From Swiss-Prot:
It is a multi-pass membrane protein. Keywords: Membrane, Transmembrane, Transmembrane helix. It comes from the Bacteria. Residues 1-11 have a biased composition (Polar residues). It is found in: Membrane. The chain crosses the membrane at residues 44-64, 73-93. Residues 12-21 have a biased composition (Low complexity). It comes from Chlamydia muridarum (strain MoPn / Nigg). Pfam families: CRPA. GO terms for cellular component: outer membrane. The keyword Membrane applies. The keyword Membrane applies. This is Sulfur-rich protein. Residues 1-21 are annotated as: Disordered.
Length: 152
């Protein structure tokens, strides 16, 4: 089809997909997802969602006290997921670099939050975020990051 001038000197194109630049076409889905996941807004969003889930589980403890007495794990799941989101947000700030101090802070947040949420007391009754499990996670992260560095 031909283009017809709308205003003198300006033509209208029937196919707007031709206007897409070559740079936008060359980005693969993986590259676009990588840019989104590495953005600061996404990382802050993770922390905000985490805080929201923790607050939600605390509110549910007051709204549904009968459920909290019989099945406390149902109310602890959003809080645990929230704490994990907060820790992922903290660890991924500053271009993905994770210092030992940040990792130690996240381990303490995870262990303390689980300890408080399971029975309401700080008595080291953790079942999920134990020192052994967290050290395994740390070993896996180190292994995966060394593989990624060797491939690149």
């Amino acid at each position: 089809m031909s283009t017809t001038p709308i205003v003198s000197g300006v033509t209208s194109q029937n196919n707007s997909s031709e206007n897409v630049s070559n740079n936008a076409r060359s980005l693969t889905l993986k590259e676009r997802a990588s840019k989104i996941l590495s953005s600061t807004a996404f990382k802050v969003g993770l922390a905000v969602v985490g805080i929201f889930l923790v607050i939600l589980s605390i509110v549910l403890l007051f709204i549904l006290p009968a459920t909290a007495a019989s099945n406390p794990i149902y109310l602890a799941i959003p809080a645990i997921l929230g704490c994990v989101n907060i820790c992922i947000g903290i660890l991924s700030m500053n271009k993905g670099s994770c210092s030992e101090a940040k990792w130690k802070l996240c381990k303490n947040v995870l262990k303390t939050s689980e300890d408080i949420l399971d029975d309401g007391e700080l008595n080291n009754s953790n079942k999920i975020f134990t020192d052994d499990n967290l050290s395994r996670v740390e070993d896996i992260v180190i292994t995966l990051s060394s593989r990624r560095n060797s491939v690149a």
